[in-house]
UniProtKB/Swiss-Prot annotation:
Pathway assignment: Lipid metabolism; fatty acid biosynthesis
Similarity-based family: Belongs to the thiolase-like superfamily. FabH family.
Enzyme Commission number(s): 2.3.1.180
GO molecular function per UniProt: 3-oxoacyl-[acyl-carrier-protein] synthase activity; beta-ketoacyl-acyl-carrier-protein synthase III activity
Organism, scientific name: Vesicomyosocius okutanii subsp. Calyptogena okutanii (strain HA)
Top-level division of the source organism's lineage: Bacteria
Top-tier EC class: transferase
Name of protein: Beta-ketoacyl-[acyl-carrier-protein] synthase III
Entry domain remark: The last Arg residue of the ACP-binding site is essential for the weak association between ACP/AcpP and FabH.
Length: 314
């Protein structure tokens, strides 16, 4: 039985079509300056013909390549997504076939907290000796459910995918995880229509989401550090859900962590929901900021609301 679940490979993928803030200003009442000041986002990526599985496949293959394992060594695949390619089967099973795996595969839907929930689930499989190698992917094509005429949401969301490969370890890995949900705030952030029968778009009460996100994530970050006896100055990096620079900055300030210890990539891809944490992680691993042995705090909140944190020694 492994004591820890350790990340041994990361990967990410963004579709080639880029929508800049200036592009958006041609169709809705906004400006680059307005968007950057309120969100920190400069551009987002948008699929043309690619599916959620297509993005996931590319990110997964890059993570598997870094991990240096054969796809047949995978014991489980968990795909976190809000934008599944079909009502059924699970997009994870389509991904399984696409990459040539033969293990069980399932989807997990917890919106922007999806990767946190999926990674925690994978950790439990490994610690219970039900799996040793697990592929966890966050992949989204949110452009399919964005109303591009709604300034409050069109400026925020983008498409992309990120992936990690987890392996059992006796030495280091995930040290702590905590998950929460509270369904009392359903109307604050949702796709209102029944998408099985109707076309629905993301609807959001921005001010309420901001307040709840900052409060919940700050409290959870403080709780995580306290329960693991880790001072914030011993934390090497925060890798947050890339939702909004104001939320990210407010949480960092509450736990007395300077922004130069926070991985921020949302300016290049916007809010990619379940893909955002693994996207940011892969970027920082590949550019050398995150190194083996670093203590990382993942934290994110999504509609529902559902939120969670993971402390990991990379």
């Amino acid at each position: 039985m492994s004591k820890f679940a350790r990340i041994i490979g990361t990967g990410s993928y963004l579709p080639p079509t880029v929508i800049t803030n200036d592009d958006l200003s041609k169709t809705i009442n906004t400006t680059n300056e307005w968007i950057v000041a309120r969100t920190g986002i400069k551009q987002r990526h948008k699929v043309t013909n690619e599916t959620t599985c297509d993005l996931a496949e590319k990110a997964a293959n890059r993570a598997l390549e870094m991990a240096g394992i054969n796809v047949k060594d995978l014991d489980l695949i968990i795909l976190a997504t809000t934008t599944a390619d079909k009502i059924f089967p699970a997009t994870a099973t389509i991904l399984q076939t696409a990459i040539g795996a033969s293990c069980p595969a399932f989807d997990l839907q917890s919106v922007c907290a999806g990767f946190i929930f999926a990674l925690t689930t994978a950790e439990q499989y490994i610690k219970a000796s039900a799996a040793n190698k697990v592929l966890v992917v966050g992949s989204e094509t949110l452009s399919r459910i964005v109303n591009w005429n709604d300034r409050s949401t069109a400026v925020l969301f983008g498409d992309g995918a990120g992936a990690v490969v987890l392996s059992g370890s006796d030495n280091t890995g995930i040290l702590y995880s905590k998950l929460f949900s509270d369904g009392n705030y359903l109307s604050s952030l949702q796709v209102s229509n029944n998408y099985i029968n109707e076309v629905g778009f993301i609807e959001m009460s921005g001010n309420e989401v901001f307040k709840i996100a900052v409060n919940r994530l700050s409290s959870l970050a403080e709780k995580t550090l306290k329960e693991t006896n880790l001072n914030s100055n011993k934390l090497d990096w925060i890798v947050p859900h890339q939702a909004n620079i104001r939320i990210i900055s407010a949480v960092a300030k509450r736990i007395k962590t300077p922004m130069n210890k926070v991985i921020v990539t949302l300016e290049n891809h916007g809010n990619t929901s379940a893909a955002s944490i693994p996207l940011a992680l892969d970027t920082a691993v590949r550019d050398g900021r995150i190194k083996r042995g670093d203590h990382l705090l993942f934290e994110g909140i999504g509609a529902g609301f559902s939120w969670g944190s993971i402390l990991i020694q990379f």
